Curated annotation (Swiss-Prot):
It comes from Drosophila melanogaster (Fruit fly). It holds the Pfam family zf-C2H2_jaz. A zinc finger (C2H2-type) spans 59-83. Associates with pre-60S ribosomal particles; released from the pre-60S particle very early in the cytoplasm. Keywords: Cytoplasm, Metal-binding, Nucleus, Ribosome biogenesis, Zinc, Zinc-finger. Residues 151-162 have a biased composition (Basic residues). One of its GO terms (molecular function) is zinc ion binding. This is Zinc finger protein 593 homolog. Belongs to the ZNF593/BUD20 C2H2-type zinc-finger protein family.
Length: 162
C-alpha cells in the first residue's frame, strides 16, 4: 500500500504576480493622458506642493503620469525606453466613442491620425510660456488615391505606343 498523495499548491508562489495587477498599481490609460495633454498640461507641470506625493508633486511627467523625487531623476526618465515607448503610443490618436460606433457598423472606417509628440518642456520653460506641442502629421495622399498595380501601368504604356 502506498501513501495518500497530498494536494499540490499550484499557484503558491505567485503573490508577486498578483501584486502587479492590483488596482493601486494601475497607471492612467492613454485616452486619459491624451485628455490631460489637451486640457491641463501646464497645470500638471506647475502643481502646488503636496507633501504626500514623491518630490512634493513638483516633478511630474505628463506623458507617463508619474511623479519623480527630483529633476535629475525626471531628466533620466526622459532618456529611458519606457518614456520613449509612451511617446510613441501617444502619437496615434486614442480610441474614441465615435471609433467604437464605426467598428460596430454605424459609419465608415477613418484611419486614426498620427501626431508628432515631443517630451514636455522643463518647469522654467513652462513658466516662461512654452507648452507641450501636439501636431497632426499630414499623410501622403498620392499613395491612397491612385492604385499602383501592374495593370494600370501596362495600360498607360499601351496608350503611349499607339
Amino acid at each position: 500500500m502506498g501513501m495518500v498523495s497530498k494536494r499540490k499548491k499550484m499557484h503558491y508562489g505567485d503573490t508577486h504576480l498578483q501584486r502587479r495587477w492590483r488596482v493601486r498599481n494601475r497607471r492612467r490609460d492613454l485616452d486619459q493622458i491624451d485628455d490631460d495633454l489637451q486640457t491641463r498640461s501646464g497645470e500638471l507641470i506647475n502643481q502646488n506642493v503636496d507633501l504626500d506625493k514623491p518630490g512634493f508633486a513638483q516633478f511630474y511627467c505628463v506623458h507617463c503620469a508619474k511623479y519623480f523625487i527630483d529633476d535629475t531623476a525626471m531628466q533620466a526618465h526622459f532618456r529611458t525606453k519606457v518614456h520613449k515607448r509612451r511617446l510613441k503610443a501617444l502619437e496615434i490618436e486614442p480610441y474614441s466613442i465615435e471609433e467604437a460606433e464605426r467598428a460596430a457598423g454605424r459609419g465608415s472606417f477613418v484611419k486614426p491620425k498620427k501626431r508628432a509628440m515631443e517630451t514636455q518642456p522643463s518647469k522654467e520653460d513652462v513658466v516662461a510660456g512654452k507648452r507641450i506641442r501636439v501636431e497632426v502629421v499630414p499623410e501622403d495622399t498620392d499613395a491612397t488615391d491612385s492604385p499602383s498595380t501592374s495593370k494600370t501601368k501596362r495600360k498607360k504604356v499601351e496608350k503611349m505606343e499607339t
